[in-house]
Amino acid sequence: MVHFVGAGPGAPDLITRRGAALLQTADCIIYAGSLVNPALLGLAKAGCAIYNSAEMTLEQVLAVMRQMEAEHKTTVRLHTGDPCLYGAIREQMDALDADGIAYDDTPGVSSFCGAAAALNAEYTLPAVSQTVIITRAAGKTPVPEREQIESLAAHGATMVIFLSIGLVNQVQQALLQGAYTVSTPVAVVYKATWPEERIVRCTVGDLAESVHKADITKTALIVVGDFLGTQYD
């Protein structure tokens, strides 16, 4: 049996009770590298085999799962945040389906929820925004043409942008092609809920400059919208 488990956004006490229980009983844990708080690995029982998937190919990960299954042992595949968002779990599940290996999913607290908590913010304010768009900029992973940031930005809704801080100049220009203006508020949240969490508040107009000045190059969310302002009904 393979359990896909969301580790949460960073703080180890934000993993779900179910997720923690699965870690405590697993025979094998395959975790998503530095994106997972190492404190969670301390929940593993004595003798648990622990693998860092950041140092493995997909086929190597699957080989470990198959070996554990052959030995009638349980594996926890520990992903950051909630695996349903940018977790790359579909290809693993398809392979397990092909092999006839049973699996299940335990959700986790996504980093976009952790970012809102860090900001003490509500994404959906009356008469401001009742829609949250979760997206990413096109990089190594392509984005469908209809889902380009400039197209989504036309809605002017609350937007949470994952995996794109290294493309911040491109993101800024795309946002300005939509309904956002240079004065639309933005928050960049680095490593939400981790001890080293940082928040940079700026506007769309000075987004790229602010990020470069703060020297944030990875592991950060860009959240955009008037929900960051002070006015609502």
What are these language model-derived features?
Residues 2, 60, 71-75, 131, ...:
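A contiguous loop/helix-start segment that scaffolds small-molecule binding in enzyme catalytic cores
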Residues 43-44, 63-64, 116-119, 136-137, ...:
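Short secondary-structure transition/capping segments
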Residues 84-155, 195-202:
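Class I SAM-dependent methyltransferase SAM-binding "motif I" and its flanking Rossmann-like core
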Residues 15-17, 114-116, 171-172:
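Short hydrophobic alpha-helical segments that form membrane-spanning helices or hydrophobic packing faces
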Residues 1-109, 208-209, 220:
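Class I S-adenosyl-L-methionine
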Residues 31-33, 79, 136, 163, ...:
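Short beta-strand/turn micro-motifs composed of small residues
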Residues 18-22, 44-47, 92-95, 122, ...:
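Short, solvent-exposed amphipathic alpha-helical segments in soluble enzyme
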